[in-house]
Swiss-Prot record:
This is Protein ASPARTIC PROTEASE IN GUARD CELL 2. It comes from Arabidopsis thaliana (Mouse-ear cress). Residues 1-19 form the signal peptide. The keyword Hydrolase applies. Keywords: Aspartyl protease, Disulfide bond, DNA-binding, Hydrolase, Protease, Signal. One of its GO terms (molecular function) is DNA binding. One of its GO terms (biological process) is proteolysis.
Length: 470
């Protein structure tokens, strides 16, 4: 499929305090007539592209965008966009339900509630997985595609015997053929990490309910995961025998949320809770990366304190204080991004949400600030969730104002142009890639994170941006 690709001259600009002498570009240039890029829907050779450094405690995996799967086909760019925005709307709704505690119950009554532990609820919604990794499960390792989810505290794969399974790209994992599979017993310390854990024939059972009512249910186990030559033993993993509502060929999910049962939490002894990622830009044939270990924390990054929400400990909240357009800070209502004592509002960084959502008052002011500085550009009708679009079909290049996030304690992140003005069809229509949130919660989505080195220092409670682009 042919997708428009535009070029930007100025990539990423960060400084450590608002009083820094470092100046910011007020405008960037978009080359509207950059030749379209053909995206080949084939899978890369992960035998060569997921790797680790055996001389360190650094584990690295390649990230693959869902559009690279051969099973994903779209008639055109317009169809691709609308499918992505439908997933995105579902994802946002699921996160809001998760934080509010309103999760749609499973309709499958063949597993009794008292057979399982309490729900480990993920922010991931049906069909919203955007990025995948390739991981070897068991001994010998069977390679599986797994969705990464920064809002989930669970690692799981579909398992035989499969009472109810969705279609996946690889054969369903069979624990009977793994020499390292060990079931977790009731009353064990691992099972106790799931509140009110349930038992079945002496084994620990789990149930993960997602925001739309999809789920995975099965047995909790300890298993070996392999990344190329790196072997990680005794990972607490769900072996799902009943799974409904998953998507696009993934075998399961690699949760990298803030809880102790996530992959990040389980590796904290070796990695200090440190990890980072570079999300591949949409519409390219390249792969991103997911790195675990202290070496994922680069020198020269700009660090922002993480904010903990006891009501939603899986999610990574950050302190956001303001927004800028063209070097001008936009006036916003006081406290519009604050996390309240009751756990409402705040700003979440999420890998599964595509488009950044802002509270309505902040979004309107931000959007209007951008519109006022792009009044010379011809407008187009809104597309999907976007209400601010431009007809750039008659242009060779366009000068646009920069967009910036002002974080707590001073750091400023100025986005590359492709992260805030995106093509939505094959006819030169570009849209301002932000949307209003239905509540006071803000979500920084993966479109705004693309191509930026993002690092999490869980031990010290910081998230870093840069210094590199990727």
């Amino acid at each position: 499929m042919l997708l428009p690709l535009f070029f930007f001259f100025l990539h990423l600009h960060l400084h450590l305090s608002s009083s820094s002498s470092i100046s910011f570009p007020d405008f960037q240039i978009i080359d509207v007539l950059q030749p379209p890029l053909t995206v080949t829907a084939t899978l890369p050779d992960f035998n060569n592209t997921h790797f680790s450094d055996e001389s360190s405690s650094k584990y690295t995996l390649r990230l693959l965008h869902r559009d690279r799967f051969p099973s994903v086909t779209y008639r055109n760019h317009h169809h691709r966009l609308h499918a992505r925005m439908r997933r995105d709307t579902d994802r946002v709704s699921a996160i809001l339900r998760r934080i509010s505690g309103k999760v749609i119950p499973s309709s499958d009554s063949r597993y009794e509630v008292n057979d399982f532990g309490s729900d480990i609820v993920s922010g991931m919604d049906q069909g919203s997985g955007e990025y995948f990794v390739r991981i070897g499960v068991g001994s010998p390792p069977r390679d599986q595609y797994m969705v990464i989810d920064s809002g989930s505290d669970m690692v799981w794969v579909q398992c035989q015997p499969c009472k109810l399974c969705y279609k996946q790209s690889d054969p369903v994992f069979d624990p009977a053929k793994s020499g390292s599979y060990t079931g977790v017993s009731c009353g064990s310390s691992v099972c106790d990490r799931i509140e009110n854990s349930g038992c079945h024939s002496g084994g620990c059972r789990y149930e993960v309910m997602y925001g739309d009512g999809s789920y995975t249910k099965g047995t909790l186990a300890l298993e070996t995961l392999t990344f190329a030559k790196t072997v990680v033993r005794n990972v607490a993993m769900g072996c799902g025998h009943r799974n409904r509502g998953m998507f696009i060929g993934a075998a399961g999910l690699l949760g990298i949320g803030g809880g102790s049962m996530s992959f990040v939490g389980q590796l904290s002894g070796q990695t200090g809770g440190a990890f980072g990622y570079c999300l591949v830009s949409r519409g390219t044939d390249s792969t991103g990366s997911l790195v675990f270990g202290r070496e994922a924390l680069p020198v020269g990054a700009s660090w922002v304190p993480l904010v903990r929400n006891p009501r939603a400990p899986s999610f990574y909240y950050v302190g956001l204080k303001g927004l800028g357009v063209g070097g001008v800070r936009i006036p916003l209502p006081d406290g519009v991004f604050d996390l309240t004592e009751t756990g409402d509002g705040g700003v979440v960084m999420d890998t599964g949400t595509a488009v950044t959502r802002l509270p309505t008052a902040a979004y309107v002011a931000f959007r209007d600030g951008f519109k006022s500085q792009t009044a010379n550009l011809p407008r187009a009708s809104g597309v999907s969730i976007f209400d601010t679009c431009y007809d750039l079909s008659g242009f060779v290049s366009v000068r646009v104002p920069t967009v910036s996030f002002y974080f707590t304690e001073g750091p400023v992140l100025t986005l590359p142009a492709r992260n805030f003005l995106m093509p939505v069809d094959d006819s030169g229509t570009y849209c301002f890639a932000f949307a209003a949130s239905p509540t006071g919660l803000s979500i920084i989505g993966n479109i705004q994170q693309e191509g930026i080195q993002v690092s999490f220092d869980g031990a010290n409670g910081f998230v870093g941006f840069g210094p590199n682009v990727c």
